[in-house]
């Protein structure tokens, strides 16, 4: 059902060196044209554009289902965050 994948996990100390490594790895993936996604709850360099590139139309489906499940704007706000807003996942 899915193409072969690989998980590249960088856990460890929250330091400048770790952040530089994560940025370097994602930069190299971008340069090589390798598709990838990143764990939401970990250190990442996600942007609205990166999320759209990684997930494509699934972003629209996410927002549609989010509106279906949380049809009240106050509920959507309760289950929101600046991260979701900035990534276009609370549209």
Residue ranges and their predicted role:
Residues 16-23, 27-91:
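Activity-critical C-terminal alpha-helical subdomain
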Residues 1-20:
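C-terminal substrate-recognition/cap domain of FAD-linked oxidoreductases
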């Amino acid at each position: 059902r899915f193409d072969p994948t690989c998980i590249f996990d960088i856990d460890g100390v929250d330091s400048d060196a770790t952040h530089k490594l994560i940025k370097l790895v994602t930069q190299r993936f971008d340069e090589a044209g390798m598709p990838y996604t990143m764990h939401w709850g970990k250190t990442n360099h996600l942007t609205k554009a990166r999320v759209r590139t990684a997930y494509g139309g699934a972003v629209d489906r996410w927002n549609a289902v989010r509106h279906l499940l949380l049809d009240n704007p106050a509920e959507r706000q309760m289950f929101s965050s600046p991260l979701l807003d900035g990534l276009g996942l609370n549209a």
